[in-house]
């Protein structure tokens, strides 16, 4: 990508034109899905960054929006809009968006987080090169186990039950992440409405799930009344989604007694970690 950027800079300098794009060479087609609700302050910036990437489609799902977000999207050329006036489920927009593009790689972002295109590119690249699920790697941003919240712990628990403890607390719950068309066809678009369940299905089907790059969405996450404080609405939703994923895993023949869970020594070590 550095060589491509140097070429573009040289061309722009010689031609006197501004080419503010990310020179990402993809073998397959790619698209992005943005889920948003009342994000008029950031949605335009999110779209601007996505338009710097080689995407065939950009799908915006406005879910229960009451601000000026709809007008902003309607003014954007080349954007597919899904407008749901009533508030649907928290992650239903992902399932809707995935049905509206035939791209080989789908990048999922939220309308309240402005992530530079350069930081989004690694997720597209990973799937283009063979990964089925490319997660945001937040491992180094989390505190020691003893100081982690209940959401981080249940994410790690699900991964460990699925024999993917190497993924830590990394989850499709967090954005950005990218998925392959193969993954979506196998787990079905509807499963994306419950991200942990979709991730569990991908792992159970032997798909390639990785966490290739890090975007710090912890500090940049927009604070709302629904995501602040212990046991907040969003935390309860995420925990419920993980319990649904565990239930689905058990229905498919999973056995908690045979899962690779923490030993007493490991639990003590993590509890006492500082």
Where are these regions (language model features)?
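Short, flexible, basic/aromatic active-site loop/helix in glycosyltransferases
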Residues: 135-140, 150-170
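Glycine-rich, basic loop-to-helix element that forms the pyrophosphate-binding segment
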Residues: 87-101
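Conserved donor-nucleotide/metal-binding helix-loop-beta segment in metal-dependent transferases, i.e.
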Residues: 118-142
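A conserved acidic beta->alpha catalytic loop
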Residues: 62-70
């Amino acid at each position: 990508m550095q060589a491509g950027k140097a070429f573009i800079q040289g061309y722009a300098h010689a031609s006197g034109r501004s080419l503010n794009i990310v020179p990402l060479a993809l073998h397959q087609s790619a698209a992005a899905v943005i889920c948003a609700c009342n994000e008029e302050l950031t949605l335009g910036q999110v779209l601007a960054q996505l338009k710097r990437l080689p995407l065939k489609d950009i799908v915006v799902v406005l879910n229960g929006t009451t601000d000026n977000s709809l007008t902003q999207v309607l003014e954007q050329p080349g954007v597919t809009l899904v407008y749901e006036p009533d508030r649907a489920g928290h992650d239903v927009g992902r399932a809707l968006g995935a049905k509206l593009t035939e791209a080989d790689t789908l990048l999922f972002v939220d309308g309240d987080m402005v992530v530079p295109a350069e930081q989004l590119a690694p997720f597209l690249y990973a799937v283009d090169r063979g990964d089925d699920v490319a997660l945001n790697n937040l491992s180094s941003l989390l505190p020691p186990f003893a100081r982690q919240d209940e959401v981080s712990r249940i994410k790690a628990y699900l991964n460990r039950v699925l024999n993917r403890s190497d993924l830590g607390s990394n989850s499709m719950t967090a954005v950005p992440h990218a998925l392959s068309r193969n993954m979506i066809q196998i787990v079905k678009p509807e499963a994306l409405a419950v991200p942990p369940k979709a991730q569990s299905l991908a792992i159970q089907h032997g798909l390639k799930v990785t966490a290739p790059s890090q975007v710090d969405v912890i500090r940049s996450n927009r604070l709302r009344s629904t995501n602040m404080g212990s046991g907040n609405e969003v935390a309860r939703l995420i925990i419920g989604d993980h319990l649904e994923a565990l239930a689905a895993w058990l229905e498919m023949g999973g056995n908690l007694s045979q899962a690779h869970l923490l030993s007493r020594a490991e639990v003590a070590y993590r509890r006492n970690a500082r």
